[in-house]
Curated annotation (Swiss-Prot):
Pfam families: ATP-grasp_2, Ligase_CoA
Role according to the record: Succinyl-CoA synthetase functions in the citric acid cycle (TCA), coupling the hydrolysis of succinyl-CoA to the synthesis of either ATP or GTP and thus represents the only step of substrate-level phosphorylation in the TCA. The beta subunit provides nucleotide specificity of the enzyme and binds the substrate succinate, while the binding sites for coenzyme A and phosphate are found in the alpha subunit.
Cofactor note: Binds 1 Mg(2+) ion per subunit.
Natural source organism: Mycolicibacterium vanbaalenii (strain DSM 7251 / JCM 13017 / BCRC 16820 / KCTC 9966 / NRRL B-24157 / PYR-1)
GO terms, molecular function: ATP binding; magnesium ion binding; succinate-CoA ligase (ADP-forming) activity; succinate-CoA ligase (GDP-forming) activity
EC number: 6.2.1.5
Domain ATP-grasp: 9-236
Family named by the database record: Belongs to the succinate/malate CoA ligase beta subunit family.
Cofactor(s), by name: Mg(2+)
Enzymatic reactions: succinate + ATP + CoA = succinyl-CoA + ADP + phosphate; GTP + succinate + CoA = succinyl-CoA + GDP + phosphate
Protein name: Succinate--CoA ligase [ADP-forming] subunit beta
Amino acid sequence: MDLFEYQAKELFAKHNVPTTPGRVTESAEDAKAIAEEIGKPVMVKAQVKVGGRGKAGGVKYAATPEDALTHAQNILGLDIKGHIVKKLLVAEASDIAEEYYISFLLDRANRTYLAMCSVEGGMEIEEVAATKPERLAKVPVDAVKGVDEAFAREIAEKGHLPAEVLDAAAVTIAKLWEVFVKEDATLVEVNPLVRTPDDQILALDGKVTLDANADFRQPGHAEFEDKDATDPLELKAKENDLNYVKLDGAVGIIGNGAGLVMSTLDVVAYAGEKHGGVKPANFLDIGGGASAEVMAAGLDVILNDSQVKSVFVNVFGGITACDAVANGIVKALEILGDEANKPLVVRLDGNNVEEGRRILSEANHPLVIQADTMDSGADKAAELANK
């Protein structure tokens, strides 16, 4: 889960990472009031989960509360790379002597953690990596040893931070590592990490991505979920513990196992080339259990997608046998009743497939069309979606 900047800074404050005071608001008048309360020049910052806010006009300096009001009025509702600004962070402006970059992330290729540090902060880190790679340090982090202040100082030194700030930077970097580990993050990034004229080290910005797989031990993270920004179908799927990702096609997909579902997406996309360019509408993995309740929940999500014209159910029976899957489909259609109003192409294979096909045949549901193979099922689903 990606966090807004203000949420990242809430975690920073929790772990004593120094930053600038401020508050979030959805109102231009409140932005003015916050600026008056701070009593100093402020930054008015769009809260969107995408980079490039400054270039898009989403970050403005306000010398007075009236300036904050004007900037807030202009920024709210702004479209930044497809993200509409609904919230603003009004934070005390800071004098900046130098800007640095620091992040902790997963290094999946090497199966470890990675610290990245650079004296070239305040600009896109991809640009630094491309134009000044020698100025960007990439330091592997031992998962057991972690990052204490001594190792944090090494990271800062390798990032070419000035000698006079190494000790102060090390304290903040070690605290950012604490955020990364204790909050189960997959990314903690500060750009810029700044030195002020009086040699304070402050995290002026913050980007944090939390690992959803750790939600069971991080109950407090639920408050960070932005339901307004989450697709309602994805939200419904999550409430039913379904692995669902909405796409932009017309063929709804249900399968058991991520690998099979990914293959199904490819086969449907290929078949769709013959039927007007039809594409998959979603990724939906129901996992190992295809009970009536699970199948009904999956179909309920997909059938509520107005873009879906047909559904392809592609299941390989393993631990869950095909007869159980077939019974699940039949009962799911009973549960949904009139809400099930789009054709379902069903391909079953694997454990007890003949019994599963018999159950579907005897049910004789008008919406269900059986397919013998994945290719024929994908072709039929694409054909139906193109009608």
